[in-house]
Amino acid sequence: RSLSRYLTFGLVFMAVLIVAFPLYRLREPTLRADATALQLQQYQKTGGELFATNCAACHGLQGNGGIGPTLNAKEFLTATTDNQIAMLITGGISGSIMSAWGLDYGGSFTDEQIQQLVTYLRSLEPNAPSVPDWQKGKQDS
C-alpha cells in the first residue's frame, strides 16, 4: 500500500514537471530579452556618465567634436565596429592626444566600462548627423 502511494506521488510529480517545463520554456526567451534590454539601458546610462566625465572635454558633451574628433557622426559610427571602437578607447591612438584608457595599457577603464562607452556611442547612431570631416574636430574646421 505505501509503495503505491509513492508511485502515485511520483507519477503526479512527473506530470507536473512535464506540463511545467514547456511553460517555462515558452516564457524564458521573454525573460532573457527583458534582461538584455535592461542591461543595454544600464550600459547606455553608465556609458553616458563615463563619457561626460572622461571624454566630453575633448570630444564634446554629445560627442560632437572639440579638440578631438566628432564621435557622434554617421560616417564614424557606420564605418567602425564595436570592437574597433573598444580598441581605440583601450589602446589610444599613437601620436595623438588620445591616450589609452584600458587598464592593460595604463588607463583607468575596465573592459566593462569600455563596453559601456561603446554602448553609449552606439546609442547616438540613430540620430547621428552626417559629418564628412568628422576626424578633424571643431578646432581644425
Which residues are covered by each model-predicted region?
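Gly/Gly-Pro-rich "capping" loops immediately C-terminal to redox-active cysteine motifs
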Residues: 48, 60, 64-91, 100, ...
